[in-house]
């Protein structure tokens, strides 16, 4: 076991954010921080096949006011059973797991190695928060690369020293070690794993604070980040927070396609609340910027809520002009409105 202690995190907001827990669905928001375990593995292969095993498991956790890191290293594959047994004993007191792609890679690999060694899986009841999925959701609109190292650079503004090595080199370095027994190159692997754990913990803390206090960040997030968080709020039925962030993202400036979509999403909430003036203002803003879907919403409003068929017809015509392809539904709506205006009584369903 290799341990690094005394990594201070006291100055950071240490809590399990309610929104972070809400997105995690099964994850409780009242977990003790001492029960949270950050995990990352380095393996003998990158594919995760039956012959792949973890030779280094990094674990991060809070011990009172300090964040500590312990690394379990497997010096020889034939010692895997005792390696896993020691690991199991160490993690038995934790009940929440935080990983980055751990649901798809690290945990299934660890479980399969336990099965091959006739051991019980180490996390049968632990709650699991995989930050990769949340990172993809929040930053897919402006970051093409959502790897942990990319998030370190672009979101956390952290940098690694020259000790670090690319992840793809790690399996071969370990295999070289097994042949030569020269452990000196492994120092870079230990550093890489240590930084992954520390970055994972930093990302966890940042996300918890960002999701609960998105407008109170020391570095103002990108407008696309506010938009993405607003969608997350909306999907978890935190509508007031969603509306606040939709407004902030529109004021911050968005690429036009995202701007129009945000106007529609924001207006939809107002429509559900029957706050027609605010909904109309957003639809009109989007319509003025060439959005046919908002024109259709305005046509529906004027026909069904106000009974102003001329306005409904006008907005339908504008929707047709802004649509780049022939839409039978719009043509049907146009003809129906013309018939109603001309006094015909034929009724068509929406």
Which functions belong to the PLM regions below?
Residues 66-158:
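Conserved DEDDh/DEDDy metal-dependent 3′-5′ exonuclease domain
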Residues 137, 143-219:
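Acidic, Mg2+-coordinating catalytic module of metal-dependent nucleases/exonucleases
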Residues 258, 290-291:
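Short helix-capping/linker turns of helical repeat alpha-solenoids
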Residues 2-10:
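Single conserved hydrophobic/aromatic residue that forms the stacking wall/gate
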Residues 229, 265-266, 298, 312, ...:
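Structural register within alpha-helical repeat arrays
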Residues 236, 273, 305-306, 341:
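Structural motif corresponding to the intra-repeat A-B loop/turn of tetratricopeptide repeats
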Residues 233, 270, 302-303, 338:
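Residue at a conserved register position within TPR or TPR-like alpha-solenoid repeats
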